[in-house]
């Protein structure tokens, strides 16, 4: 069994720390990767972080994860509310999936309240800032280890 966890991020998350810091905070995607790698390493896992502003590239990463990852943490960002393609790709992945959002999407605009990804996710974290990624990695480690 592989011990790699894919952490997939959707559009505009490359601007984390710069774009709307009042909502998303001041930490960057590199900070997310560093923090998640440390959490995973404590449990004997590794992470592979990927970000794209393109839906098809995220779908391709999910397809790759079918062979290379034990679990997926995904923040699909705006694709959360629109992407049946990402949902379908996640249905083809057999391991655990945790959906993660930095902000509490349920306290924001009503169009953000619906998630296609939640139809496949084993758990959803929203509103914990980037700490939510760490919580998601901990849970994926547990699920991949059989817990």
UniProtKB/Swiss-Prot annotation:
Positions with a binding annotation for substrate: 75, 81, 88, 102-103, 112
Record-level GO BP terms: amino acid biosynthetic process; aromatic amino acid family biosynthetic process; chorismate biosynthetic process; quinate catabolic process
CDD domains: DHQase_II
Catalysed reactions listed for this entry: 3-dehydroquinate = 3-dehydroshikimate + H2O
Active site: 24, 101
Subunit record text: Homododecamer.
EC number annotated for this UniProt entry: 4.2.1.10
Protein name as catalogued: 3-dehydroquinate dehydratase
UniProt-listed Pfam families: DHquinase_II
The organism's place on the tree of life at top rank: Bacteria
Naturally occurring in which organism (per UniProt): Cereibacter sphaeroides (strain KD131 / KCTC 12085) (Rhodobacter sphaeroides)
Any one GO molecular function term: 3-dehydroquinate dehydratase activity
Stated role: Catalyzes a trans-dehydration via an enolate intermediate.
Family: Belongs to the type-II 3-dehydroquinase family.
HAMAP family xref list: AroQ
Keywords: Amino-acid biosynthesis, Aromatic amino acid biosynthesis, Lyase
């Amino acid at each position: 069994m592989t011990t790699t966890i894919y952490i997939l991020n959707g559009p505009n998350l490359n601007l984390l720390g710069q774009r709307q810091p009042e909502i998303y905070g001041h930490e960057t995607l590199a900070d997310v990767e560093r923090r998640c790698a440390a959490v995973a390493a404590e449990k004997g896992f590794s992470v592979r972080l990927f970000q794209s502003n393109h839906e098809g590239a995220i779908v391709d990463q999910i397809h790759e994860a079918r062979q290379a990852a034990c679990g997926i943490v995904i923040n699909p960002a705006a694709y959360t509310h629109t992407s049946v393609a990402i949902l379908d790709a996640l249905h083809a992945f057999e391991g655990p999936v945790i959906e993660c959002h930095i902000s509490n999407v349920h306290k924001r605009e009503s169009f953000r309240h619906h998630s296609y990804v939640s139809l496949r996710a084993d758990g959803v974290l929203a509103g914990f800032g980037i700490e939510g990624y760490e919580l998601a990695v901990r849970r994926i480690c547990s699920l991949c280890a059989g817990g």
